[in-house]
């Protein structure tokens, strides 16, 4: 906003209606969103500026039970997801034999794990690093490798080419100036 000389206005939303907010012109740009062909049918995306992947989390005390993706894909395992997220779709694919428990925002999937109402949940490697630091009772399951490497971008109006061009040029300029690298260092993040 400061680069454009405008005032930032934050508009509350949730994941299940983030695309609808763009298409209904409730806001001009979203927070980071993983690229999704389904979303791209109705909303525009900026160029990507970061890549992440999906990892599972559980309670540290349950790590002896969960060492792989297959360990989680069991009929007696409950996997919590936040309704409307990419992880909700991924969980249904990764864990067809597990019980998928979709949580309505503002509640969060990891809270179900902390409360003992779910055995695991999946999230980005970025959020996982923050969660295990914030909640020491959580742990990242030491899977062979993360799944679904995914670029992040911002959702925008697909019919506004001037806005799309402006944001894409801004992203390119900020990449060249090290802005995104600085953010990654500040928040101890690693892009894939």
Language-model regions, residue ranges each:
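Acidic, polar ligand-binding/catalytic clefts
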Residues: 2, 7-71, 139-140, 144-147
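Alpha-to-beta junction loops
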Residues: 5-7, 23-32, 76-78, 105, ...
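Short helix-initiation/N-cap motifs at beta->coil->alpha
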Residues: 9-20, 101-115, 150
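A ligand-binding cleft/hinge motif common to bilobed small-molecule-binding domains
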Residues: 17, 33-42, 90-93, 114-115, ...
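Periplasmic-binding protein-like
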Residues: 51-58, 125, 129-172, 190-192
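Short helix-loop capping/hinge motifs at secondary-structure junctions, enriched
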Residues: 61-68, 101, 159-165
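Short loop->beta-strand "edge-of-pocket" segments that line small-molecule binding or catalytic clefts
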Residues: 69-84
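Ligand-binding clefts/hinges and TM-proximal coupling segments of bilobed small-molecule sensing domains
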Residues: 86-101, 140-143, 171-192
């Amino acid at each position: 906003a400061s680069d454009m000389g405008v005032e930032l206005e934050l508009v509350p939303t949730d994941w299940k209606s983030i695309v609808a907010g763009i298409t209904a012109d409730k806001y001009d740009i979203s927070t980071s969103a993983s690229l999704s062909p389904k979303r791209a049918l109705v909303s525009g995306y900026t160029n990507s500026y970061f890549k992440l992947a999906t990892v599972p989390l559980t309670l540290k005390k349950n790590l002896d039970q969960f060492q792989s993706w297959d360990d989680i894909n069991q009929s007696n395992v409950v996997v919590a997801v936040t309704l409307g997220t990419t992880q909700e779709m991924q969980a249904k694919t990764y864990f067809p034999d597990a019980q998928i428990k979709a949580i309505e925002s503002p509640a969060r999937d990891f809270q179900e794990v902390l409360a003992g109402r779910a055995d695991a949940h999946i999230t980005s490697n970025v959020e996982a690093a923050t969660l295990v630091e914030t909640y020491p009772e959580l742990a990242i399951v030491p899977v062979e490798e993360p799944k679904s490497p995914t670029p992040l971008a911002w959702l925008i109006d697909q019919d506004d080419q001037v806005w799309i061009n402006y944001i894409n040029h801004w992203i390119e300029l900020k990449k060249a100036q090290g802005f995104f690298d600085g953010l990654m260092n500040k928040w101890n993040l690693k892009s894939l």
